[in-house]
Amino acid sequence: MRDPRDIIKRPVITERSMEMMAEKKYTFDVDVKANKTEVKDAVEAIFGVEVEKVNIMNYKPKAKRVGRHAGFTNRRRKAIVKLTADSKEIEIFQGV
């Protein structure tokens, strides 16, 4: 099994993700090879909360150019984690 800190990369702080916190939904960038079960176990291990549901979205790389040089951005995977009703809040999102 992989280390939970290798699965969860960083929290996603956007206007929409802050609104979803009222529904106990938290958004994270996760490893592109992680599945829902691994994300659930990682969030529970790192933050000590109970996870009810995990939704995962894949983002394709975008084509970018700088002068004559063309390339692509990295592909991403984003997870929206819904906590149970009796679970505590995640502290890293407080005060943002």
Swiss-Prot record:
InterPro entries: Nucleotide-bd_a/b_plait_sf (IPR012677), Ribosomal_uL23-like (IPR013025), Ribosomal_uL23/eL15/eS24_sf (IPR012678), Ribosomal_uL23_CS (IPR001014). One of its GO terms (molecular function) is rRNA binding. One of its GO terms (cellular component) is ribonucleoprotein complex. It comes from the Bacteria. GO terms for biological process: translation. Keywords: Ribonucleoprotein, Ribosomal protein, RNA-binding, rRNA-binding. NCBIfam families: PRK05738.2-4. Part of the 50S ribosomal subunit. Contacts protein L29, and trigger factor when it is bound to the ribosome. One of the early assembly proteins it binds 23S rRNA. One of the proteins that surrounds the polypeptide exit tunnel on the outside of the ribosome. Forms the main docking site for trigger factor binding to the ribosome. Belongs to the universal ribosomal protein uL23 family. This is Large ribosomal subunit protein uL23.
